[in-house]
C-alpha cells in the first residue's frame, strides 16, 4: 500500500490567520507566531513566499504587533510588479508564508537614552513598528508624552493608523495593561500631502516652520527632554535626521543609546 503523501510545508512556515485590505495599495495580515520567537517591540523579521524555482523570496517587515501578542501582525504596500508584494497581496486565511524567526532592528527602547517625550515619525507603512511600540506597556512607563505623526498622500491611507489609535484608546486591553491615565499621554498627529485634510503638509515642513510644535503646544525639542524614532521613505529619513540634529539630538544604536533612531532597513 502506498502511504498518503504528506502535505509539503514551507521552511519556517507560519499560517495566515487574517487579512485586511485598506486600499488598492495597502493591506495588513496576521500570522501564527513561532513558539521560539522572542522579539522587542519595534523590531523586524524576514518574511516571504517560495518562488516558482522553490527558492524563498524574502523581505524585511516590521512586526506591527506588540511583543506580548500571541499573533504576529504585518502592514504592507501592494506593488503590482513587485517581486514579493505582487504575490503577497493575494494571501488569504489558511495560506502559509515563510517567517525567519531572527528579529533585528534599531527602533527599540534600548537604543534610546531616558527622556520625557518620544516622537514617532512615520510615513506610509512606516507606521508598522510604531503599532508595536504604541501597544508596548514600557512606552507608557518610560515617557510622559508620546507623539505619533503619520503622513500619507491620501486620507484613506491613514485608516490603519486611525484604527490603531482607536483600538488603543477605547478602554480595552491597553487600558488594562497601562491604565486609562497613561493612555492620555498619547497624541496622534496625522497629515496628508495630496488629499485635503485637517492637517496638510510634509511633517518635515511642519517641523521646520514651527507649525507642528505650535499645534501641539510644545515650546521646543531638545536633547534633555526629547527622543525620536523615524521610519519612512529614504527622503524622510535623511531630512528628519538633519532636522533632529539641528535640535541637538544625536543618533543612537543598540550598542550606543542616544536621542533618536532611524530604521534603515525600511524604505517605502
Report residues per predicted region.
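Histidine-anchored nucleotide/phosphate-binding helix
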Residues: 129-139
Amino acid at each position: 500500500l502506498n502511504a498518503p503523501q504528506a502535505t509539503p510545508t514551507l521552511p519556517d512556515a507560519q499560517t495566515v490567520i487574517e487579512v485586511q485590505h485598506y486600499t488598492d495599495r495597502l493591506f495588513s495580515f496576521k500570522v501564527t507566531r513561532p513558539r521560539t520567537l522572542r522579539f522587542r517591540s519595534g523590531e523586524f523579521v524576514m518574511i516571504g513566499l517560495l518562488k516558482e524555482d522553490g527558492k524563498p523570496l524574502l523581505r524585511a517587515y516590521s512586526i506591527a504587533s506588540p511583543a506580548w501578542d500571541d499573533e504576529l501582525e504585518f502592514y504592507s504596500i501592494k506593488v503590482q510588479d513587485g517581486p514579493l508584494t505582487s504575490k503577497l497581496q493575494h494571501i488569504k486565511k489558511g495560506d502559509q508564508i515563510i517567517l525567519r524567526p531572527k528579529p533585528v532592528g534599531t527602533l527599540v527602547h534600548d537604543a534610546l537614552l531616558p527622556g520625557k517625550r518620544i516622537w514617532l515619525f512615520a510615513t506610509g507603512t512606516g507606521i508598522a513598528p510604531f503599532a508595536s511600540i504604541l501597544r508596548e506597556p514600557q512606552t507608557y512607563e518610560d515617557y510622559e508624552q508620546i507623539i505619533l505623526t503619520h503622513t500619507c498622500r491620501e486620507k484613506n491611507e491613514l485608516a490603519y493608523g486611525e484604527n490603531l489609535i482607536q483600538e488603543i484608546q477605547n478602554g480595552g486591553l491597553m487600558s488594562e495593561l497601562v491604565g486609562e491615565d497613561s493612555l492620555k499621554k498619547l497624541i496622534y498627529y496625522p497629515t496628508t500631502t495630496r488629499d485635503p485634510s485637517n492637517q496638510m503638509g510634509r511633517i518635515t515642513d511642519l517641523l521646520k516652520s514651527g507649525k507642528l510644535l505650535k499645534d501641539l503646544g510644545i515650546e521646543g525639542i531638545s536633547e534633555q527632554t526629547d527622543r525620536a524614532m523615524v521610519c519612512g521613505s529614504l527622503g524622510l529619513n535623511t531630512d528628519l535626521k538633519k532636522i533632529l540634529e539641528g535640535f541637538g539630538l544625536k543618533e543612537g544604536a543598540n550598542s550606543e543609546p542616544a536621542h533618536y533612531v532611524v530604521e534603515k532597513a525600511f524604505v517605502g
